[in-house]
């Protein structure tokens, strides 16, 4: 167990915390334009300010990518305060991670629409069909809230996910029903805790 950070190191740690938080906020804002927003039940639909990033997608993608790079650098910078004779406390680390997690927790999915396929297959499991035999379209119907957000390439495709993930997904589906926003949030919280992944991965 190392000694607490001195004043100079503490100020440097706070700058690193702010740097990482800025990166995650950039990712969250950029995801409003470059992210994989749901086709229906989009809570930002009709909100003029929140829909602005979708009209400047190149800028949004740049913001998201810049934020991701900043987040990766912040992780590396944070490491210096977790090693050596003087280290940040557990509470300081927890506050830092929480600050970095929140923007990514509420941001739209980024870089991939896989989460919608996962939610659709989880719903198929919940209603008693075999997700390894039917895809979202034949299992739920083309007009189902989850199917509509699944890329057309995968709407007929059976589940590629393992039994454990589908079991977890069935529980999420039972809890959230057809509320796609609540399902995405639960998916992020539950699966990432189980997988033990970094906050930077929470937006997937």
Kindly label every feature range from the protein language model.
Residues 27, 104, 165, 195-199:
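Alpha-helical transmembrane segments of multipass membrane proteins
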Residues 24, 70-80, 182-204:
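Transmembrane-helix motifs of polytopic, lipid-linked glycan transferases
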Residues 1-27, 42-103:
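Start-transfer (signal-anchor) and selected internal transmembrane alpha helices
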Residues 63-70, 162-163, 167, 190:
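Alpha-helical transmembrane segments at the extracellular/periplasmic loop-to-helix junctions
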Residues 87-186:
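Intramembrane catalytic core of multi-pass membrane enzymes that act on lipidic substrates
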Residues 29-37, 107-108:
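C-terminal TM-helix exit segments that contain a strictly Trp-centered aromatic cap at the helix terminus
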Residues 31-32, 45, 170:
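Membrane-embedded alpha-helical segments in integral membrane proteins
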Residues 1, 12, 34, 127, ...:
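Residue-level marker of positions within ordered structural domains that often coincide
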């Amino acid at each position: 167990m190392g000694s607490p950070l001195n004043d100079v190191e503490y100020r440097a740690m706070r700058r690193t915390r702010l740097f990482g938080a800025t990166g995650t906020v950039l990712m969250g804002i950029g995801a409003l334009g470059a992210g994989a927003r749901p086709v229906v039940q989009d809570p930002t639909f009709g909100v003029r300010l929140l829909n602005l990033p979708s009209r400047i997608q190149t800028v949004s993608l740049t913001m998201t990518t810049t934020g991701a790079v900043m987040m990766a650098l912040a992780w590396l910078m944070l490491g210096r305060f977790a090693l050596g004779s003087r280290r940040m406390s557990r509470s300081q680390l927890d506050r830092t991670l929480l600050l970095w997690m929140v923007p990514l927790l509420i941001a739209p999915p980024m870089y991939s629409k896989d989460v919608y396929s996962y939610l659709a297959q989880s719903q198929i499991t919940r209603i008693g069909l075999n997700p390894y035999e039917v895809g979202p379209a034949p299992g739920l119907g083309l007009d189902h809230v989850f199917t509509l957000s699944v890329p057309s390439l995968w709407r007929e495709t059976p589940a590629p996910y393992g039994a454990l993930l589908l079991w977890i997904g069935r529980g999420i589906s039972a809890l959230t029903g057809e509320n796609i926003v609540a399902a995405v949030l639960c998916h992020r919280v539950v699966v990432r805790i189980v997988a033990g992944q970094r906050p930077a991965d929470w937006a997937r």
